Structure formats: structure tokens, C-alpha cells
Amino acid sequence: INWKAILGKIGKAAAAVI
């Protein structure tokens, strides 16, 4: 599992929502 990629996607999603 590529945690950095997952966290990156979550970070982008959060940034888009905020």
C-alpha cells in the first residue's frame, strides 16, 4: 500500500473541500 499516495489524494480532496 502506498500510504504517501493515499495521503496525497486525501490532502487534495480536503484542500478542494475547504
From Swiss-Prot:
Keyword tags: Amidation, Antimicrobial, Immunity, Innate immunity, Membrane, Secreted, Target cell membrane, Target membrane
Residues the record lists as Isoleucine amide modifications: 18
Tissue: Expressed by the venom gland.
Name used for this protein in its record: Communis-AAAA
Family: Belongs to the MCD family. Mastoparan subfamily.
Disulfides per UniProt: none
Source domain of life: Eukaryota
The organism's taxonomic lineage, starting at the top: Eukaryota, Metazoa, Ecdysozoa, Arthropoda, Hexapoda
UniProt organism field: Chartergellus communis (Wasp)
Signal peptide start-end: none
GO term, biological process aspect, one: innate immune response
